[in-house]
Amino acid sequence: MRKLTLIGTALLIAISSYAGGLLTNTNQHIAFLRMIARGASLQIDGVYSNPAGVAFMDNGLYFSLNGQSAYQTRNIDATFALFPEKTRRYKGTAAVPIIPSAYVVYKHDNWALSGFVGVVGGGGKASFDDGLPMFDSRIMAGIYAASQKTITPDMYTINSSVSGRQFIYGAQLGLSYRLNKYLSVFGGGRMDYFSGNYSGYAIAKLKANSATLTDVELDCDQTGWGITPIIGLDYKNGKWNVGVKYEFRTNLNIENTTKKNSDPDGTLADYKDGVNTPNDIPSLLTVAVGYQFTPRLRATAEYHFYDDKHARMANIPGTTTGKQHALTHGTNEFLAGAEYDVNKMITVSAGVQRTDYGLSNDYQSDTSFSCDSYSIGLGGAVKLTPKLTMNVAYFWTNYSKYTKSTDASSRGGYNDTTMSGTDVYSRTNKVFGLGFDYKF
C-alpha cells in the first residue's frame, strides 16, 4: 500500500503543476509580421502599435481584417539516472490554424476614434502526447524508493499525456486627438477575457500482470477577465516620427470550472472547482522612432519593456512565492525594421527583433518555460485597388536553449525525486499571415 500511495502522489503533483505562463502577443497586424518595428506607424495598424498616431491619418473610415497561422514546437531533453536511455526527448506541439484580428478607425479633423479586437495573449494550444519529464521521473523515483530498489524501469510501463489551451481575447476602444501639427495623444482601454483548459492523465502498470499501480485524471477549464488602461503619445516633425504607448498592468484572476479531478481536496487542490489563481498581464512600455530616408524608403527602431516582476503569477511549485519574484528582470525587446516602395503598387519590408527575458531556474518548468530569442519578419504590401491593400508576411523565431540543472541536495532535488537531473528547453516558432486594409 505504501508503494501505491507514493506513486499516486507523484503523479498528482505532476499534473497539478501544469499551469502555463501567459504570453503577450504583439503580432496583431500583418504589417508587424512583415516589418516587426511598427511602433511609429501612422497607418491603421497603429490602432494597436501606436494609437496616438492614427490622429495623423487622413479623414475617413478605415477597416482592416487580418489572419495568422502559427505553429510551435516545445522540446525538453531530460537527463535522469532512472531513464534507461539517460537522456530522453519530450516533444510538444502548439498549433493555431487561424488567429484573427480586426481594426477600425474613424478620423475627422483632429479627432480619431479607433477600435480593435484580437487575441492579445496566451500560448495557444499545446500537447505533450508522451507526457513530461516531471511525470516520468517522479513515477520512476517513487517506484524505485517504495520497492526498496527492487522494481526497475524495465518492469513497468507509464502511459501519460498532458495538454493545455490558453487564449486571451481583447477588445480595445480609444480616442486620439491631434493637439497641433506636431503632437497627438491617445486615451483608451482594452477588455481582456481569458479562456483556458488543462487536462492530463497518467497510468502506471506492471508488465508482469498488467496490474494498475495508479490512474490519475484532470480536466479543468479556466476563465477570467480584466481591464487594461492604455495611453499614448505621438510626435511628428518632418521626416521623423516618434510613437510612445503605455499599457497599465491588468489585474487578472482565473477561476476553475473542473470536470475531472482525482484529488480535489489533496494535491490537486489548486484545480478544485471554483479556485482562483492570479495571472496578471504585465504593464508594457513601447517607444519607437521612425525616419523617412527617401519618399520610398522608411525605417523604424523600437524598444519594448514588460514589467513582469510586478505582474502577479502562479506560485513556484512547492512554495508560496509567486513566479514573478524568480525573474531577474522584466522582458526587454529591441526591434528594427524597414520598408521600401518598389513602385506605386508594391512595398517590400523586413525586420528583426531580440527578446531578452530575465529567466531563472525557479521560473522555468516543464509546463511553462521561455527562451530568449531572435525573430525575423519578411513580407510585403500590394495595393490591389486605390482603396484596398493586401499584406502578406512570414515570421520566424530562433530560440536559445535554456539548461536547467538540479542537484539532489537542492529543494526536493530534480522534480522532487531527491535525485539530480537536467532539462534542456528549446522551442521553434513559425507564423504566416495575410491581411487586408480598406478605406471607405
Kindly label every feature range from the protein language model.
Residues M1-A19:
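Gram-negative bacterial Sec-dependent N-terminal signal peptides
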Residues A14-I15, Y62, S184, T403:
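Hydrophobic alpha-helical membrane context
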Residues I15-G122:
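N-terminal, post-signal peptide beta-strand-biased segments of exported outer-membrane/organellar beta-barrel
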Residues G20-A37, S41-L42, I99, V105-F440:
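Outer-membrane beta-barrel porins/channels
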